[in-house]
Amino acid sequence: MRKVVVFAVSAVLLGAAVFFAVKKPSLFLSKASQTRPSFALKGDPDAYEKSTNQETLAGDHGEAEGGRLSAAEEEYQQRAYPADEIPFSLTQNAGAAFDQAVGRGQGANVGQWVLVGPSTATQPGILNFTGADTITSGRETALAIDPNCQVSFCRLWIAEAGGGIFRTDNALVASPTWKFVSGSFGTNAIGALTYDSKNGILYAGTGEPNASADSEAGVGIYKSSDGGDTWSLLSGSTSAFFGRSISSIVVDPLDANTLYVGSTRGVRGVSSVSSGGATTNPPVAAPFGLYKSIDGGATFTFIWNGNGSARGVNDVELDPSNHNIVYAAAFQQGVWRSTDGGATFAKIFSPIAPTYNTDRAEFAVTALPDGKTRMYVGDGAQGTPRAKFFRTDDAAAAAPAFVDLTTSGVANYCTGQCWYDNVVFTPPGYPDIVYVGGSYQYGEYGGISNSRGLVLSTNAGVAFIDVSWDASSDTTPAGLHPDHHAVVVAPFNPYIFFDGSDGGLMRSSGDFKNQSALCAARGLTGSRLTVCQGLLSRVPKKLYNLNKQLSTLQFQSLSLNAADPKNLMGGTQDNGTFEYSGSSVVWPQIIYGDGGQSGFSSGNPALRFNTFTGQASDVNFQNGDPTKWVIATGPIANSPEGSYFYPPVTADPNPTMAGTIFQGSQSVWRTQDWAGNQAYLEANCPEFTTAYNNPACGDFVQIGPAGATDLTAAGYGNRDGGYVAAIERAVSDTGTLWVATGTGRVFISKNADAADASSVTFIRLDSFALNAPGRFVSSIYVDPANPNHAWISYSGYNINTPAQPGHVFEVTYDPLAGTATWTNLDGGTGPMGDLPVTDLVRDDVTGNLYAATDFGVLTLPAGTTTWESAGTGLPRVEVAGLTIAPGARKLYAATHGRSAWVLQLP
């Protein structure tokens, strides 16, 4: 995948700037999880009842059942490969290696990283479920509100999955002012926020616990006594939680030194591509589970293993009437209770899907007027049985009796991804009020419900109303983003709720309007009409979008228009693909879904492509017009081959081959005319209404000898398995293609442009060099002056391939001798250390290399052996991809949580 704008070197191309796109983290998508959630058309509220295609539309508006969890395991496996585990010391050493490189300073004239946005990521109504224009930001994992919040001064903290912590003191205005407050953290992946208002202490647990492919691991717990202006790391939290993700922090209301902390498995790193096999979690680092501190976090004691959960403890609360009673939920294990401060535990609620390690129970406890404790529980996994909702009014009883309250208003509330988006919240002092959030009901919205993404009960869970859309318009209302993770309310009004989701933050007005009359207009009758009328009987009058100023998108990649270095596209986690045209404030969304890679044609920037998850990709012939995207990879998606979650894709950087796109699964697939005839594709394969695996949409074909196109097969020797992980074309000719797999195989083809796809041949190069690592290949950068010369980066750790250490190599293929050499560039006077690299680009003007890592960007100046910091000012954040424009002297970084940044090169 090209990540550079290159100025042509031949007479034919003299003066022409040619380019292609970068890459993004690519994760495995099993064949079983390739269907897409439904997408009803704007203006056709009953499309969910009429369409037969809705489960296979390309735009990925939800998490494929099982996909996010298996992908999370693959992100972990990417770092571990070829071993099964990542030892605790390696993740610590990687961070230390990065810090050492930064500590060496920076080279002359290397400047300051600048945020290029967006701070206002706009989504046009045509791409939104409700039809209303909106603004989005990155995934939020936790919220905390000051109980002294009033209309005139309301302090709210929000936690981002990869973007840190932001604070506002005017949370109740239409557009709050946000301040980033976690710049000193060792990671900006946040999983938990707890405000001890009695003592004025804010706790932040690092590492996201939501079991997604990019749920990044943390480094421990930070503490602030001034609202987040300054922080200190709890000394005992590093050994207990480094490399883990924190789900809950609970402070004993009678003893501020007593803390209970739940931890889960986390993922270290979002890279350009992802590994194949998933494994169980071995006992590395500190075990995940439930910990207790009695000295304010100076030390932590492991008190419960989640009864052997393979995922960890996802929820912890104390009984409101007895602080010695501890409730905890663990993946696949239901809800447990301790009556002796955590010394012993017993199960009180059994999971509904005990055979799935994806089963996740979320609960909330509240005090009843009679002194007893009520507990609400939402539980589900993936597939069947569908998610259910329960309540007991005496959680402290010897054997609590849970009543199944799974009515149509709350049934299947988190669909097939309860392990990812699942929240149950009851406001303190309002025991009959409960909010339940999960994912969109894609087959219902605009029909029997407004999606039921977030529902509210005011009668203790007996009945629910749908608060996912507001009443500001009957036709284009404001709505909540799918995938909900956190809810809090204004302390003086339990109906003013703040909702944190994959799309950022929304707030309700706190009052309601009856919109049940809309149900009949939707053509509903009988019981369906009755259900709809109940759900829409109290709809929020207004939902406020609070995402302005939040530059927290989780970019997977950035691509660049060769004709204009200020024109970018970038794919983001669950927020689609956005376009940058010079403004660091506003980037419009040009297509929805889980955005992966994107790119422009090297010959005509009006031709674009984007990828969703799996093998679903679109092309566009009309400058990215949101209504003109067409399905392009039907033949690939309809094939028996598997791929990574975001398969590698690259368009040919040579303008004479401007219609060619390559995409990797197990084979390399190719189109030579931008996926087919424009008129045919626009007439028969529009993105909004076409199944993503329609074999008639797109003309991609496998390249390579008949019967031997699969580059991961055993027929090519050792290191078999995995999928194609990296593809890169040489700009200086028309036929050289470099390809790598997730197991460390590296190939070169010298005739990838052959008209007869079956005549394309591949030569395996890694087998020529004893020092070529058998680890995950994260990127390839081809020398624009020599198609047989490239730089290759590797993920993983040297300890797993001790005879083949290294993360950055210079590789030269000698076609006459039939040999290839690998030169390790990690070492020297300033070694990189055992630091996985997520992406690599080269400044072809100076020869400097730039490496993206889990912690930031490093550079190796030409002619030196010293890796050092690439500029200053970039937050501590995982960098998923780099895109360079040597002629314009710009290096762009796609960060996974702090949006997009640029470094002006010397």
PLM feature spans:
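Beta-propeller blade termini and top-face loops
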Residues: 31-906
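N-terminal Sec-pathway targeting helices
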Residues: 1-11
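Hydrophobic alpha-helical membrane-insertion segments, chiefly the h-region
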Residues: 13-24
